[in-house]
Regions:
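C-terminal segments
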Residues: 1-125, 129-131, 135-224
């Protein structure tokens, strides 16, 4: 978000842009993640490779990322007997960019920084513990809260988790989920149920909420 930028046109490749007449104050498009959001598929490490190239030229500020990942670190310690979950949590930690700030190239006399912040809450829907933990690790890696259906599976799992993790989990009855506040959705399960969930999410008023749908056991979640 730019405030009071005395600019009527953005320089392509240097400054983010806001559309016709919107290059001053207001929300912006552009930046290192822009093109990736237009792709239907991509390598899982694509974002990390892009940022690594930039970080080699300019130092990265990751102080906030360290704080955001404390619940994820607690999950990793809890998963001492689950090597696959530990490895996946570490992978998500390395891929997640929430809490990072980078100085972007720009014209003399102007300072442009890119700061990536987490959304507030992510609805996670799964019908088995493995997928619920995959979703949990991904959401904690980016610093968000988890919204779980109030079911026996999720309640029992939450009781096993360390306090630092369970404090980041919220519950709602299944019939109340569409009316709850959440900013994104992660789903594991059958395609028919995914279609129904997408219809419910699309019928909500307000901002468009993205839904990531996966078959059971898949872990190639997009974290940005």
């Amino acid at each position: 978000l730019y405030v009071n930028r005395n600019m009527v046109g953005a320089v392509v490749g240097v400054q983010p842009f806001g559309g016709e007449g919107l290059s001053g104050t207001g929300p912006k498009a552009g930046g290192p993640l822009y093109l990736y959001r237009l792709l239907s598929s991509r390598p899982q490490d694509a974002v990390g490779v892009t940022f690594a190239r930039q970080d080699a030229e300019r130092p990265l500020d990751a102080q906030l990322k360290t704080l955001l990942e404390k619940p994820l670190q607690a999950l990793q310690q809890w998963a001492a007997g689950r090597p696959e979950l530990q490895a996946l949590s570490q992978q998500y930690s390395e891929q997640a960019q929430s809490g990072t700030q980078r100085l972007l190239p720009g014209p003399t006399g102007e300072r442009n920084t890119l700061t990536l912040m987490p959304r507030e809450r992510v609805l996670c829907v799964a019908d088995n513990e493995q997928d619920a933990l995959i979703q949990l690790a991904a959401v904690l890696a980016v610093g968000c809260e988890v919204l779980w259906p109030d079911s026996a599976l999720q309640r029992d799992l939450a009781k096993k988790l360390p306090r630092e993790v369970s404090e980041r989990i919220r519950f709602a009855k299944a019939e109340q989920l569409p009316g709850q506040a959440f900013d994104a959705v992660i789903y594991h399960g059958d395609s028919d149920q995914l279609r129904e969930l997408c219809e419910q999410v699309a019928a909500r008023s307000g901002a468009i909420v993205s839904v990531q749908g996966f078959a059971r056991g898949e872990d190639n979640l997009q974290l940005e």
